[in-house]
Amino acid sequence: MYPYILFVLLFVLNACGNVPPDSYTAPRSPEVVARGAHLVKGLAACGFCHGVSSAPTSPLAGGRQVYDLYGAVESPNITPSKSGIGLFSDQQIEQSIRGIWKDAADKRSPTIHRGHEWLSSSDALAINAYLRSLTPINHVVKERRIGFASRNSTGLFSAAATVTGHVADTNPHDKIPYGKYLVNHVARCGSCHTTEASVFSSERYLAGGKIIRVNTQQYVAPPLVGTAQTMNTWSEPAIIEFFKAGKRPDGMQVKSEACPVTFYRQASDEEVTAMMLYLRSLS
């Protein structure tokens, strides 16, 4: 009798735990939408690629040329129109934020959202809620195809993790861990500033050297750690000044087309302080 009851219980629990992935509906409360807006216009800097122009207030209709592992590509429309994300389920939007594409494995780099794979579930759902709240813009963006040879010979050392389960929040009151979360998974500083692995060397965290292409210009991402002049050695006010004003200690203004400093200015004082404390904790 008891084995039979146990079997039934396991069957019911398994059935309840395997709800069709597209069936859940993300929260849409004003508080959740506001959190999403804060992230999209701030540290997550979605408009840096998806905006009609690279500005926090620009419509997110895509179409601007950006670069990934395979070269030039037009950024997708992420407004809730049929030509954007309007036909996506909530789960598909969350997965796209994490770099798991709905049906476009042959169109985009698997690392274009690298870092966001560990975005907390609540933050991913907040971004989803905000994007859903936007005015739909019907703007069809040309899709790119990547050939078999390129897909299987490019970026062999740049694979991103695939995260499909729940990702817990990081407590904002734990300043250094929260700063680490913001640096790595919201602002994704490593997507530009981490040295990529190669046949002869392993990846080096925030060590710089990556070529950033913007239109006809090229920039080399500087290291954030590793020398006596890198950001982790700056004073607390200097790091805060960088995030709030886009200015380095030497007075040089950071180019907003190469780094999303105009988005970083929207970050809260608490977020900037946490990031500063984390960066200063690095040796």
Locate each region found by the language model.
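Extended, well-folded interaction surfaces typified by the phenylalanyl-tRNA synthetase beta subunit core
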Residues: 139-152
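Sec-dependent signal peptide recognition
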Residues: 1-8
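Extended amphipathic alpha-helical interaction segments
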Residues: 148, 163-171, 181, 191-201
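Axial heme c-ligation environment in periplasmic c-type cytochrome domains
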Residues: 72-87, 98-124, 221-233, 245-270
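C-terminal motif of bacterial Sec signal peptides marking the signal peptidase cleavage site
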Residues: 14-15
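The canonical Cys-X-X-Cys-His
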Residues: 36, 43-53, 127, 179-182, ...
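Electrostatic cytochrome c docking/interface patches
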Residues: 20-41, 154-184
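Ligand-binding pocket scaffold of soluble enzyme catalytic domains
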Residues: 127, 131-134, 138, 236, ...
